[in-house]
Regions:
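Flavin-dependent oxidoreductase catalytic cores
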Residues: 1-297
């Protein structure tokens, strides 16, 4: 082996969990364990694909992200016991490879939720949205830190999450992590204070105009993310490792205006100076690992 590659095959730790090497498969669409729009569904094809990657020697596998409450605002991910009963024997087989597996749990999309014209029409009409909510709750699916324009639909504005909705979601992050640990999963990754997704919308001052405990100071804007890791440790144990998907810099010039590499611009989102403060807050809250990138799509 070329000596410059030797470090790839050395172990490292995330919290107390040792990863056998430094080859990591990050989350990608189409690689989920619990499906996407199918509530309470264990994806056998996705599971087989991930198991093969572990057999091929990948040290850590992160399946595609799982929204903590299904995309249309109906079922919570922790609500179906059968799904976790199927997961347990799968994890027993998976661990025979020596690889570790973290599940990426998502706090939703907020203003980044892709909507069709008919969904935007529902979201703009309180009565129609209420009538349709047992099937699709567009207003909940697009809810964000504050009233902000949808990324894809000019004529739809996200409503702010209530404090009660935030705290309900925080609790379900903990409940889901507990069930995942009981099923043999090695850790979780929280999606995400990155790329303009929902938790990132809370974290960025120009997207968060709240005056309660989830807005204002950097500590308050990160409170949603820090309460999640604290609740996970409360329910799943302090030694259960939690990673965070994180964008070091937002690289945005304004609403729907991205910056190109090496371009000179005034940062609309999170800059490096703020990021250096943010990572300390997140680490002190209990995150064991930051899975970092740059930019916002």
């Amino acid at each position: 082996m070329n000596p410059k590659y030797e470090a790839l095959f050395t172990p490292f730790k995330i919290g107390e969990v040792e990863i056998p090497n430094r080859i990591v498969q990050c989350s990608m669409g189409g690689t989920t364990l619990f499906g996407w729009l199918e509530p309470s569904h264990f994806d056998l094809e996705g599971a087989d694909f991930l198991l093969q990657r572990a057999k091929d020697g990948v040290g850590l596998v992160l399946p595609g992200m799982q929204v903590i409450r299904d995309t249309m605002g109906r079922k919570w991910l922790d609500s179906n016991r059968q799904m976790y009963r199927v997961l347990k024997p799968y994890m027993d087989e998976y661990h025979k490879t020596g690889s570790k597996l973290f599940i990426q749990l998502a706090g939703g999309f907020g203003r980044s939720m892709a909507v069709t014209p008919w969904m935007a029409a529902l979201g703009r009409n309180d009565l129609l949205n209420k009538l349709a909510s047992p099937i699709v709750d567009v207003q909940y699916a697009c809810a964000s830190a504050s009233a902000t324009p949808n990324r894809w639909a000019d004529n739809l504005t996200s409503r702010p999450f209530t404090v009660e909705e935030i705290q309900e979601m925080v609790w379900h992050f903990g409940a889901t992590a507990k069930k995942l640990r009981e099923a043999g999963v090695d850790g979780v990754e929280i999606h995400a204070v990155h790329e303009g997704y929902n938790l990132d919308q809370f974290a960025i001052a120009n997207m968060n105009f709240r005056t309660d405990q989830y807005g204002g100071s950097l500590e308050n804007r990160l409170r949603f993310a820090t309460e999640i890791v604290q609740e996970i440790h409360e329910q799943a144990g302090d030694d259960f490792p939690v990673s965070l998907r994180y964008s070091v810099r937002s690289c945005t010039k304004g609403w729907r205006k991205g910056a190109m590499p090496y371009e000179e611009f005034e940062e609309f989102g999170r800059d490096m100076a703020e990021s250096e403060k943010a990572v300390k807050i997140l680490q002190d809250a209990g995150y064991a690992f930051l899975n970092c990138d740059n930019g916002t799509y």
